[in-house]
Amino acid sequence: KTRAELKYDAKALFKGRWKDAILLNLIPTILSIVVTLLIAAVVISLSDNADTTLRNWLDNVMFSDEGTGNGTSNVGSGILSTLFTVGISFTFLDWFRNPKMEINPLKNGLQVFTKKYFLRVLLIYILTSIFTTLWSLLLIIPGIIKSYAYSQAYLIYKDQSSSISNENISSLDCITESKNLMKGHKWRLFILDLSFLGWDILAVLSLGIGFIWLMPYKNATKVAFYQDLINNN
């Protein structure tokens, strides 16, 4: 399918049910708004007329690695953000396949934190992070390419966990399958991501409020991309 068709599928899914989609994405949306506001605060604080004390405090909070465990905090926030997003993607995948399904925003959005998914999803995150970092040591471009190659591993795991015993699912196999599935499609997904850039900028300019609608739209479109991949393989 074309980018326009994938985006249409996402919007069609939400027709009459935008409230469900927004509530499902509430936690990562709030995080995005907070980050946007913090960035805005930093920009303001660095202006010539900003208060020096505020500027120094924001510099320490946002950029300092000393004493506060900022590096560890960044890793932790990255893991949490991924877990929330994956749980939402799992729900969208079920929703695409059963458009009339009832959405429980809290239960569905946090499903990755259950025994069925948590450890395997976390392991996929750790492995893909390690692999991407190692490739990035060569040059940044190989790291970006590999991140796209690994991008479908979570949804592949979701499908496999529904068909066979959890104990038999290998996180590494899901990553390998993602690489195979993405052969010839990495650039396509990159362009799909790029097509949202204008909306991302508008969302930031609205101090993050636009993410309330944009986050569900982007997440659902990426799930539609995965569904299209497996339909054609």
Question: What name fits each language-model region?
Answer:
Residues 1-233:
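Hydrophobic alpha-helical membrane segments
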